[in-house]
């Protein structure tokens, strides 16, 4: 049998056979790599050897960064080598900072975006897209008709003072009366919203459509006996462009666990 002295022991046994203190860390640079060897105790209170290999690379940094790297260390880290010490320094992930600009620059950016929006304009609904991409190209509203007003007879100075004139035929400072305005009402900017919840209220409808632009009239259909919503409503916008935007956004939009169906309101047959 070979003698016990001839058996080679491992490096861990050799380290444990020492006085009990950890050997100092060593650092070797060769072939463009830095090899750092350290000794420490693990969870089981055993000495372990940790070898770290770093690749050396040269980068160009700003002068302020180079000046910070040349600052002398102090305190408990006065004797540390250049670079972070893993026992006292934890390298975390990079945090990117976002600088907030002043309001004038933000306003300039918004004005630039608004000018870009006016480059493309649909001839059908005046939306911000090409005419052949318009979703309402083949609908009944692809060519909106101008509201026709009934001709108002001219009043002369020779008319009799006691003659009766219907209200809708009267003129006030060159403007048609109330009756003529109602007969010439433009419904081309009205939309119909379907598949609404029974709990829908006028306040909810106002909150739903007010972000698309000003409107002149809203009608929420309700049941006469129960007072609940019948499931549809009409909204008249001042601008047909705002109405087209509302249709594009709300059609297929999920609201109150239901999918809304929004379309152009069909014009009523003249009576």
UniProtKB/Swiss-Prot annotation:
GO cellular component, one term: eukaryotic 48S preinitiation complex
Cell compartment(s), UniProt: Cytoplasm
Annotated SMART domains: RRM
Keyword Cytoplasm on entry: yes
Occurrences of domain RRM (ranges): 189-267
Keyword Protein biosynthesis included in the entry's annotation: yes
Pfam families linked to this entry: eIF3g, RRM_1
Keyword field: Cytoplasm, Initiation factor, Protein biosynthesis, RNA-binding
Alphabetical list of CDD domains matching this protein: eIF3G (cd12933), RRM_eIF3G_like (cd12408)
Region of interest: Disordered: 1-29, 143-185
Single GO molecular function: RNA binding
Broad class of where this protein is predominantly found: cytoplasm
Function statement: RNA-binding component of the eukaryotic translation initiation factor 3 (eIF-3) complex, which is involved in protein synthesis of a specialized repertoire of mRNAs and, together with other initiation factors, stimulates binding of mRNA and methionyl-tRNAi to the 40S ribosome. The eIF-3 complex specifically targets and initiates translation of a subset of mRNAs involved in cell proliferation. This subunit can bind 18S rRNA.
Family label: Belongs to the eIF-3 subunit G family.
Subunit and partners: Component of the eukaryotic translation initiation factor 3 (eIF-3) complex.
The protein, known as: Eukaryotic translation initiation factor 3 subunit G
Source organism: Anopheles gambiae
Gene transcribed to yield this protein: eIF3-S4
């Amino acid at each position: 049998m070979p003698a016990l002295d001839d058996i080679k022991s491992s490096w861990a046994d050799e380290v444990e056979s020492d006085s009990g203190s950890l050997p100092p860390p060593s650092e070797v640079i060769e072939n463009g790599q830095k090899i750092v060897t350290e000794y420490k105790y693990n969870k089981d209170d055993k000495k372990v050897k940790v070898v770290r290999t770093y690749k050396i690379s040269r980068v160009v940094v700003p002068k302020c960064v180079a000046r910070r790297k040349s600052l002398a260390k102090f305190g408990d880290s006065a004797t540390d080598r250049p670079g972070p010490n893993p026992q006292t320094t934890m390298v975390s992930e990079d945090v990117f900072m976002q600088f907030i600009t002043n309001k004038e620059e933000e306003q300039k950016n918004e004005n630039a975006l608004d000018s870009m929006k006016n480059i493309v304009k649909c001839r059908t609904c005046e939306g911000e897209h090409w005419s052949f991409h318009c979703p309402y190209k083949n609908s009944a509203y692809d060519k909106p008709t101008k509201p026709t007003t009934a001709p108002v007879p001219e009043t002369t100075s020779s008319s009799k003072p006691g003659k009766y004139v219907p209200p809708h035929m009267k003129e006030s400072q060159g403007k048609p009366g109330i009756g003529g305005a109602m007969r010439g009402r433009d419904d081309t900017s009205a939309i119909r919203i379907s598949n609404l919840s029974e709990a829908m209220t006028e306040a909810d409808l106002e909150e739903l459509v007010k972000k698309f632009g000003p409107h002149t009239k809203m009608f929420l259909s309700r049941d006469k006996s129960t007072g609940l919503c019948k499931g549809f409503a009409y909204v008249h916008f001042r601008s047909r462009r705002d109405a087209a935007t509302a249709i594009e956004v709300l059609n297929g939009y999920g609201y109150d666990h239901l999918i809304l169906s929004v379309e152009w309101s069909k014009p009523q047959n003249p009576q």
